[in-house]
Amino acid sequence: MYMDAFGWSAPAAPCQPSCGPGGDDDDDVLLAAVLGASFELHSLVDGGGNGAAGAVRSDDAYGLDVDLPSHQMSLLRCQDGLSALHGDASPTAAAAAFLDSVDVLPVPAIAGATHDDGGLLDRFAFPNVAETTTVQAAASNTAFSGYSSNTTGGGNISSGESNTYTEVASTPCAVSTTTTTTALPPSKRKLPEKYPVVGTSPTTKTTTTSETAAERRSTKRGAGGSSSITFGGGCHGAGAAAALLGYGRGYEPDTEAIAQVKEMIYRAAAMRPVTLGGPASASDPSSRPPPPPQRPRRKNVRISSDPQTVAARLRRERVSERLRVLQRLVPGGSKMDTATMLDEAASYLKFLKSQLEALETLGNGNGNGNLLHHGYYTGSRNATATAATGSSNSTVLAFGRDGLAGFVKSNRNLQL
């Protein structure tokens, strides 16, 4: 038999309903139906008090040789095959017929049954619910009966089929609902410690790919945006050279040495010939300065003929031309940007003015050979001293009469 093949031959515990409020007179009969390997009535207790006249033979309805009182006639019918049994049918045959189906039939209408007595079986008669509600059976017969009523032949029960049949049968005295909690499948995402965006708490917000990329870009900007390269704490010239030589941030440049170097550079620049495009340059083409580089004309560009636009363009061209001339006059101006070149031009101009004052003093015959009586250039913009002050706290670089003779007597054009 199917029960022995699956190892479910052990009988289930009988379900004994509790007694109602009717007392001992109403609870004369104790009905116990065992669902499993056997289907039999364990005991029937005759309350006595209604007499044999009120008893009806139950073998007409169930095939069991038992006398029931007349006020206990509302019985549940758990199997449609029991109605076809005869009076000599055994409980084993009834159990075999029960195993073929688990459908619930309505309560049979038995003649002489009364529902006003408040008997034990009246509260278990459900004339309307019996057609829609399945009766839950023992756990051992649930899976087999559900499987045998929906499949043909033997075979293994798969996990999908076993999870499908949630409606099971049981005795009418203890109708309960079994809730099965199915655990969630394991997540296929990466580990949270490697990818902190994926959290395990229910309040974790799933971020999109664009948000993650934006966070990464902002992190990179915050890490690399504060880096800067400084040479000598922002000093020009000597500070940058000191940083390149490895003196560090605490290096303090020697201002006197810097002034001396500038004096030497300005002296060499003042003694070189300067050509500004005079009439002599027309006869000597070699002394002509190289023409400015021609910019390629842009295609599909319309040049405006508006007077204001033309005037602004001409003004920009004149400024550019003057900057190019000044770049040739300032020592090292061709290797500087416009702002640095203008700064050096101011320093060079002060040096030239100091030299002019010294030459004018020597030309008037007032000089007695003492170089301290003449103004000199110290390398700084506002560090011009005179002999009256008698200050000698900076480097003095002056020229004597013999030293300046060749420069003064030359026919070079010193007009600026």
Curated annotation (Swiss-Prot):
<keyword id="KW-0805">Transcription regulation</keyword>
<feature type="compositionally biased region" description="Low complexity">
    <location>
        <begin position="200"/>
        <end position="212"/>
    </location>
</feature>
<comment type="subunit">
    <text>Interacts with PIL13 and PIL15.</text>
</comment>
<dbReference type="GO" id="GO:0003700">
    <property type="term" value="F:DNA-binding transcription factor activity"/>
</dbReference>
<keyword id="KW-0804">Transcription</keyword>
<protein>
    <recommendedName>
        <fullName>Transcription factor LATE FLOWERING</fullName>
    </recommendedName>
</protein>
<comment type="similarity">
    <text>Belongs to the bHLH protein family.</text>
</comment>
<dbReference type="Pfam" id="PF00010">
    <property type="entry name" value="HLH"/>
</dbReference>
<dbReference type="GO" id="GO:0006355">
    <property type="term" value="P:regulation of DNA-templated transcription"/>
</dbReference>
<feature type="region of interest" description="Disordered">
    <location>
        <begin position="176"/>
        <end position="226"/>
    </location>
</feature>
<keyword id="KW-0010">Activator</keyword>
<feature type="compositionally biased region" description="Low complexity">
    <location>
        <begin position="176"/>
        <end position="186"/>
    </location>
</feature>
<feature type="region of interest" description="Basic motif; degenerate">
    <location>
        <begin position="303"/>
        <end position="316"/>
    </location>
</feature>
<feature type="region of interest" description="Helix-loop-helix motif">
    <location>
        <begin position="317"/>
        <end position="352"/>
    </location>
</feature>
<feature type="region of interest" description="Disordered">
    <location>
        <begin position="276"/>
        <end position="311"/>
    </location>
</feature>
<dbReference type="InterPro" id="IPR045843">
    <property type="entry name" value="IND-like"/>
</dbReference>
<feature type="domain" description="bHLH">
    <location>
        <begin position="303"/>
        <end position="352"/>
    </location>
</feature>
<keyword id="KW-0539">Nucleus</keyword>
<dbReference type="GO" id="GO:0048586">
    <property type="term" value="P:regulation of long-day photoperiodism, flowering"/>
</dbReference>
<dbReference type="GO" id="GO:0005634">
    <property type="term" value="C:nucleus"/>
</dbReference>
<dbReference type="InterPro" id="IPR036638">
    <property type="entry name" value="HLH_DNA-bd_sf"/>
</dbReference>
<dbReference type="InterPro" id="IPR011598">
    <property type="entry name" value="bHLH_dom"/>
</dbReference>
<comment type="function">
    <text>Transcription factor involved in the negative regulation of flowering. May be involved in the repression of the flowering factor GI and HD1 by interacting with PIL13 and PIL15 and competing with PRR1. Possesses transactivation activity in yeast.</text>
</comment>
<dbReference type="GO" id="GO:0046983">
    <property type="term" value="F:protein dimerization activity"/>
</dbReference>
<dbReference type="GO" id="GO:0048587">
    <property type="term" value="P:regulation of short-day photoperiodism, flowering"/>
</dbReference>
